């Protein structure tokens, strides 16, 4: 471990639980810190807080009392979902209490090298692809971070023979100071989470934190399909390795249906195990990382050919009487849904869309939804999505929730069609997260098959 005594006997406040906060609290306690956990959920409805209390960790629940910070804390570790304009965080910063996220703790204790993956779309798929390729090559890629496995929890069990393959959100990267991956990937940068960050430039700045401590000995893998990525190359000390589906670059690229790395064919694009142009980009990013880690082409090809995707990201669910169901609940913005649709024939797609309206420009979807067989629209953003459907000339019906939407979509579909849940919106108007929304879609498909 990089630190042994750094936290010993230090008073640390963990703000917000969920998976990452719970993991951070246990790790800090293990490292000898004097831990206090503060979570807004009432104690009686808070199994994580109950469990931590049983382990001897102090917990304060049901709100975030500012007077708690009258104690002399040496450090605050915050849940990444809590914004920096939260009064507790503002007071901590005013008192010059360092505020970190759990990812920083993972870096500080990790004996394993770290590959960090961030971006607006494609993070989970690319992270999973990289992890599977490295593991197939004997390099033990351990998935962690925003992908569902708390980074600090995985870091505790990782050795120097493993590699931490870490999916990182902009929320997590806002709280890093010393974090230093040996390879970082930025899949793409699109306007999203503006309600959290305030502006696109602030969002990009948060993502860009991934490379702050990198040097010329480290590698930064960037998507040269985007001019923004090209512009950012002059602002890093890291060695930039580009990937692109649009041009030949000094890295990974697509040419005549083949995926190359620096002039050498690795595999054919149509051999990738999951559909869609976006997955070609994800595969190219993966190839760049794999080649930087000296993985042979055959291992890369075999792994990516067998790759079955990830849950909630263009996940094939089932086939009922010739109608195929795909769960793309993780598509919480316009670009993700555009890329999902690119893998299908619109005339055979019944699209389920809508959810929490976070200021998306739904007119951008009009060219992509033109020609759809039908749409099923739901959620807070329904009126704006319906206006986009009208402009595209697509007929639609409305639904009250995901179960209702799934049933109506199936009624509208015929043999050979696809029912695609790709909402282009966050889930929080109806559901706790996109996973809950996707699981309800899967459950309803199972009921339809009975």
UniProtKB/Swiss-Prot annotation:
InterPro entries: Mur-like_cat_sf (IPR036565), Mur_ligase_C (IPR004101), Mur_ligase_C_dom_sf (IPR036615), Mur_ligase_cen (IPR013221), MurD (IPR005762). ATP binds at residues 119-125. GO terms for molecular function: ATP binding; UDP-N-acetylmuramoylalanine-D-glutamate ligase activity. It catalyses: UDP-N-acetyl-alpha-D-muramoyl-L-alanine + D-glutamate + ATP = UDP-N-acetyl-alpha-D-muramoyl-L-alanyl-D-glutamate + ADP + phosphate + H(+). It is found in: Cytoplasm. Pathway: Cell wall biogenesis; peptidoglycan biosynthesis. It comes from the Bacteria. Keywords: ATP-binding, Cell cycle, Cell division, Cell shape, Cell wall biogenesis/degradation, Cytoplasm, Ligase, Nucleotide-binding, Peptidoglycan synthesis. Coiled coil: none annotated. GO terms for biological process: cell division; cell wall organization; peptidoglycan biosynthetic process; regulation of cell shape. Pfam families: Mur_ligase_C, Mur_ligase_M, MurD-like_N. Cell wall formation. Catalyzes the addition of glutamate to the nucleotide precursor UDP-N-acetylmuramoyl-L-alanine (UMA). Belongs to the MurCDEF family. This is UDP-N-acetylmuramoylalanine--D-glutamate ligase. It comes from Streptococcus pneumoniae serotype 2 (strain D39 / NCTC 7466).
């Amino acid at each position: 471990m990089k630190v042994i005594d750094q936290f010993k006997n230090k008073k640390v406040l963990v703000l917000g639980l969920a998976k990452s906060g719970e993991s951070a609290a246990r790790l800090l306690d293990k490292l000898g810190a004097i831990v206090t956990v503060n979570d807004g959920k009432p104690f009686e409805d808070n199994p994580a807080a109950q469990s931590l209390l049983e382990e001897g960790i102090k917990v304060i629940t049901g709100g975030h009392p500012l007077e708690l910070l009258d104690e002399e804390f040496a450090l605050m570790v915050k849940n990444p979902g809590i914004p920096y304009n939260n009064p507790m965080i503002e007071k901590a910063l005013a008192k010059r209490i360092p505020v970190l996220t759990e990812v920083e703790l993972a870096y500080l204790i990790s004996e394993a090298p770290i590959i960090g993956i961030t971006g607006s779309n494609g993070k989970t798929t690319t992270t999973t692809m990289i992890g599977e390729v490295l593991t197939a090559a004997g390099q033990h890629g351990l998935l962690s971070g925003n992908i569902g496995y708390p980074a600090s929890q995985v870091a505790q069990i990782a050795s120097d023979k493993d590699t931490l393959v870490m999916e990182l959100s902009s929320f997590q990267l806002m709280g890093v100071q010393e974090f230093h991956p040996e390879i970082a990937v930025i899949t793409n940068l699109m306007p999203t989470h503006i309600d959290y960050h305030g502006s696109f430039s602030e969002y990009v700045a948060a993502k860009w934190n991934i490379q702050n401590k990198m040097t010329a000995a480290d590698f930064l893998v960037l998507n040269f399909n985007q001019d923004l990525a090209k512009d950012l190359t002059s602002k890093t000390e890291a060695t930039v390795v580009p990937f692109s589906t649009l041009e030949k670059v000094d890295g990974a690229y697509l040419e005549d249906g083949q995926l190359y790395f620096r002039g050498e064919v690795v595999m054919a694009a149509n051999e990738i195990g999951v559909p869609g142009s976006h997955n070609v980009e994800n595969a190219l990013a993966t190839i760049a990382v794999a080649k930087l880690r000296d993985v042979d082409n055959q291992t890369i090809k075999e792994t990516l050919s067998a790759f079955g995707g990830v849950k909630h990201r263009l996940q094939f669910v089932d086939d009922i009487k010739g109608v195929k169901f795909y769960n793309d609940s993780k598509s919480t913005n316009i670009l993700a849904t555009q890329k999902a649709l690119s893998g299908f024939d619109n005339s055979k797609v019944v699209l389920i869309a809508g959810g929490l309206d976070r200021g998306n420009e739904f007119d951008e979807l009009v060219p992509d939804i033109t020609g759809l067989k039908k749409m099923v629209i739901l959620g807070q953003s329904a009126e704006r999505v319906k206006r986009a459907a009208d402009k595209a000339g697509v007929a639609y019906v409305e639904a009250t929730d995901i179960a209702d939407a799934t049933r109506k979509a199936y009624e509208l579909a015929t043999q050979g069609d696809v029912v695609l849940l790709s909402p282009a919106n966050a889930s929080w108007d109806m559901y706790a997260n996109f996973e809950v929304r996707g699981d309800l879609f899967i459950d309803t498909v199972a009921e339809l098959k009975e």
